[in-house]
Each structure stands twice: as structure tokens, then as C-alpha cells.
Design a protein with these regions (language model features):
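Short, surface-exposed beta-strand/loop "edge" segments at domain boundaries and coil↔beta transitions
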Residues: 21-30, 59, 102-105, 117, ...
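Acidic, proline/glycine-rich low-complexity IDRs
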Residues: 106-148
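Surface-exposed, low-hydrophobicity interaction/linker segments
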Residues: 52-109
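Hydrophobic, Leu/Ile/Phe/Ala-enriched alpha-helical segments that form helix-helix packing faces
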Residues: 38-42, 85, 129, 133
């Protein structure tokens, strides 16, 4: 029996800063899409993954260093990651890699605090990202490599 070759990874990018709906005070605002928000958008798909954080040393918050350290080795399950402080904060230039066992399934890249880049072979994940973030556009491999 022949093994099915893995699907190629595809990438999209979208703006990290979003216009918010008016609040009780009536004024619209802007909000930053956090890692926590993205994980919630992935729903059950994300729950089965463990995460490894790749962050530069100069992150402004101690919470990111803690997350990176704890994600070494086997990684952090999604629910444990969501319970930490860092996923609710804005990072600068960070990769969050989601694994199913030893297989990398998804990379969420926070680039320059201005965009999120998503890389996966899973069409459902890309569809969900596009549904929640309609400005998501395809990226080339060269564009992906330039943001690292």
C-alpha cells in the first residue's frame, strides 16, 4: 500500500489590528488580534494540538519568556497555553507552532505587531481564518520567508 504524500503548506496573512464594533460608550475603537483570539477561532481543531513558541529574546514581557521556556520539548497543550498570560498579550515577531504528535500542522506567526501570517496544509483552518478575517490574502513562500 502506498502512503499518501503530505499536502503542501499554504500561507495567508491578515492585519493584526482590527476595527472594533462600537462599545457601550458608543465609540468604535481598534483591537489587536491576540494568540488567544486565534486559538479560540480554531475551536476543536486547535484543542488537539500542542504548541511551541519561538520568540526573540527581546520580548517586552516576562510572560513570553515563561511561555517559550515551558513550550520547549513536548510543547504546551492548547488549554494550558490559554491559561497563561502571554497568549492574551501583544508579542513582536513570534512563531507559534501547533503540533499533532510530532507533526507540525500549523504555524501562527505574529509579524512586527502589524500582521498575523498563518501556514498550514489544512483547508478548513484557512477557510476559518478567511471567514473571521476577510482581509486575509494568500502569501508566497518568499513572502513567508521574508517575515521570519
Amino acid at each position: 500500500m502506498t502512503e499518501t504524500p503530505p499536502l503542501p503548506m499554504r500561507m495567508v496573512t491578515f492585519a493584526a489590528w482590527r476595527d472594533s464594533a462600537p462599545h457601550a460608550a458608543g465609540a468604535p475603537g481598534r483591537h489587536y488580534v491576540t494568540l488567544a483570539e486565534l486559538l479560540v477561532r480554531l475551536g476543536g481543531y486547535g484543542l488537539g494540538l500542542t504548541w511551541k513558541a519561538r520568540l526573540p529574546d527581546e520580548q517586552p514581557r516576562v510572560a513570553f519568556a515563561r511561555m517559550a521556556k515551558e513550550s520547549e520539548g513536548a510543547g504546551i497543550p492548547t488549554l494550558e497555553l490559554l491559561a497563561m498570560d502571554a497568549p492574551h498579550l501583544q508579542a513582536i515577531d513570534a512563531d507559534f507552532e501547533g503540533y499533532a504528535g510530532d507533526e507540525l500542522r500549523l504555524t501562527l506567526r505574529e509579524f512586527d505587531s502589524s500582521s498575523w501570517d498563518v501556514r498550514t496544509a489544512d483547508a478548513w483552518v484557512l477557510s476559518e481564518i478567511r471567514r473571521h478575517y476577510p482581509d486575509a490574502r494568500p502569501m508566497t513562500a518568499d513572502e513567508w520567508n521574508a517575515t521570519h
